[in-house]
Structures are given as C-alpha cells and as structure tokens.
Amino acid sequence: IELHRQARREGWSKHEFLVRAAQIPGVYVPSLYDVAYNDDGTVKSITANEGAPKVVLKRVVQNMDEAYYPTKTIVPSTEIVQDRVSLELFRGCIRGCRFCQAGYVYRPVRNRSEKLLRDYAVEAVEDSGYQDMTLSSLSTSDYPHLVELCDDLEDFCAQRHVTLALPSLRADNFSMALMERLQKGRKTGLTFAPEAGTQRLRDAINKNLTEEDLLESCRRAFAGGYSAVKLYFMLGLPTETDEDVLGIADIAAHVMHAWRESALNKTRGVRITVSTSWFVPKPHTAFQWEPQIPIEEYERRVKLLREAMNTKSVTYNWHPSPTSFMEAVISCGDRRLGKVIETAWRKGETLSAWEDYFDLNRWMEAFEECGLDPHFYANRRRSEDEILPWSMISCGVAPGYLKREHALSYEGVTTPDCRTHCNACGANCLVGGKCDV
C-alpha cells in the first residue's frame, strides 16, 4: 500500500510499480514471468523478467502473539454458515499428511500463547454476542496447551451459556480429560477424520493413525455420553483399491460395535455419519504429481461403498463428482485457464462453489472454445522432472522433500510428526531456523 501511494505521488508507470512491487519479499507479479509450453502442453520454461526473483518465497507471520487478532467481528443480520466465534489456536500443522495442501503451505508451526487466546475468546464473545465458539486450527488437538485453555474458558463459557466446540479431532490423542471439558456446556457430536479405510492406505498417505486409535476414542466418547460421531474419508487416493473402499464400511460397522460395547444409555440410539470426498491433487504437496481418478471410476467406488453400508444407524454422504472434477482442473491448472474461467463466466457461470449454480456443461464448452482439455489437468500423472505451473512459487518446503514423501507413499512408509522428529522439510527457513513445535 505504501509503495502504491509512492507510485501515485511520483507518477510511476504501471510497469515500474510492478517491478518495484516484485522486490518486496513474498510478492508474486505474474506479468513479470514468461511461460513457454512444449508441444504436448506441458510447461517448457518459466523465465523471470529483469527485476523479478526467479522463485518467490512465501512470507509468514513470525510471532503469532505479536500479530493483530480481530475480536470485533461483524455480525450479520441473517444466519450464516460460520455463525460463531472462531478462535485460531496456532498456525501450521505437525502431522504431514501427504494429500493436505494446508499442512504444507502453512508450515512452520507457530503457536499462540494460552493467556492471549483466553483474552481473545472473552473479547470476541462479549463483542459479538455469539453463543458458540470453535477452537480452530488444522489439527486443534495438537495444540500443546489445549486442556489448560479449556480449563481457563470453562467458567466463562458456563456463565455466558457458550458452547465450546472442536473441529475434526485426532483420534490418537483424544483424551477423556478433554472430553469432560467439552461436556461442561451443551454437548455436541464428535468428528474424526481417518481419511482411508485400511491401515495400508493410511500409511501411504501418512495419516499415522490406527483403527484401534479410532475405536478407543469412540469407546471413550460413547462411555462419556456421546451418541453422534462423524467420520470423514476420501475416495480416489493414490494406490487405493476396492479393498480400501470397503474398509470404510468395515470401520463404520466397528464403530457401531464400539457403541454397543461402551454406551451407558442405549435408549437414544446412535448416529454415525460417514462422509467421503473425492481426492483432489494439490500443488505444493507430496501428491502434486498424482492424477485424479476419472469421474466414472469415482462414481463406481461411491456405489460400491454405498451398497456396503447396510447398517441402519449409519448415514453415508458423498461429495458430488462434477464440482470436485473442476476443482482438480483448476488446482492443477496453468495461466491458460484464465481465459477458460473468463469464458465460463461470460456464459453465465457464477457462484460455482454452490451446486445450485454449478453447470459442468458450461465449463466444458468454455474449455472447448479455448482449445484446452480439462482432463489434461485433472487426470494426467505428472513426471517428477516436469516443470510445474507453480514452480516459481515456494512455500518454504523443499521440492526434494516432497519427492521423498511421494516415494515413501508408494513404499507404505510413514514419516513421524514434527514434534516427534524434525524431518528437515525446509520450512524452518521462514522463521529464522527454528519451528515452534
């Protein structure tokens, strides 16, 4: 902003302003990079013009406690999806799931102090009037002071009738002490994300979670009075087989058995919700070279799982295929897709994230008019030697680390979390050499 003000005062040209802006660490100026393509459509070269860095390195907030935190939120007059206070405990993730873009690009881990979080929570509730608060992060239960924070907020939440909720939890560190603190307010359901139906596939994606971890957490929850559990999985993960798909139904049945074993009050019954999404390869992850399975194959796997879900108390929800296909196309796309997006918009495509507005036919017509094949982006396996459209951007994680993780996935070898062992991903360079794990 200061540079733009200076440009206006001194009468710079647009190009001069952009060149100066490119000198600011973390600023990417697309027009200062020339991209050439091979005959097969892959990227041949990405050349930085004079004044632009060859690779733009992401900038991060160094100290979360010193960063501005918005507690005076705008409260809309209509009901919205995120109708609550959302308290971010820390940024980054220690886990390293190989499919997760956020887990890579938000590295390194940087925690907020427990005392400041308590103050932020009180201010946000008092200023907004919300009666629901979510303690959010990529893996909330990995916050090192979570139990202490819940203790600090316990009396305040009880007095203000505020429900304290956690998003998807790690089943391998879910504790009874944590559950008891959640029970102080209005009880809500619990959500776990095993992601895959077999141990082999969970190891391949580096989930570092066993079925027994999940079942033990469910037993504790059911014994503590919970009667609703949501389980999140993905279909189409690299190396997935029908056995892995059917393993999801097996896990749901085992969770049902855990409820029968552990629930103290069975009169209310149990609600187990299994939700599956479609794997979308994302840039800057260990699976950025992987293809998305074709729509027909995804729908076959959904049908296979749906037919295997024959337990009355288990509800199965799945993500529609057309929107996930287009998400993969755009996620793995290059700058040529800009014209496609504009063409689709001119055809009337707006608010495409909503199924009511999304029209795959309009998108396919736009691709045809622009002479591009969407399957080239979504369903093609990429060589690790290929220049990727996002190669001029670095999130701090070394490309060699991603290649190593990619290879380990096919070997079924897991990588320990950052708190257990530093895996030398390279993201520590963003915070002076030491992560806050």
What are these regions (language model features)?
Residues 1-102, 108-109, 115, 353-357, ...:
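Acidic, low-complexity intrinsically disordered segments
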Residues 1-47, 286-334, 341-355:
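Glycine-rich beta-alpha loop elements in corrinoid/cobalamin-binding modules
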Residues 8-14, 36-39, 131-134, 161-165, ...:
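Acidic/polar loop patches that form or flank catalytic/metal-binding clefts of enzymes
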Residues 17-31, 138-143, 167-173, 236, ...:
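A glycine-rich phosphate-binding loop feature that marks nucleotide/adenosyl-phosphate handling sites
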Residues 24, 64, 82-86, 94, ...:
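Active-site lining segments that contact anionic ligands and/or coordinate catalytic metals
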Residues 82-86, 98-108, 130-139, 197-204, ...:
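Glycine- and acidic
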Residues 122-273, 277, 281:
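Conserved SAM/AdoMet-binding glycine-rich loop
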Residues 310-437:
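Radical SAM enzyme core and accessory elements
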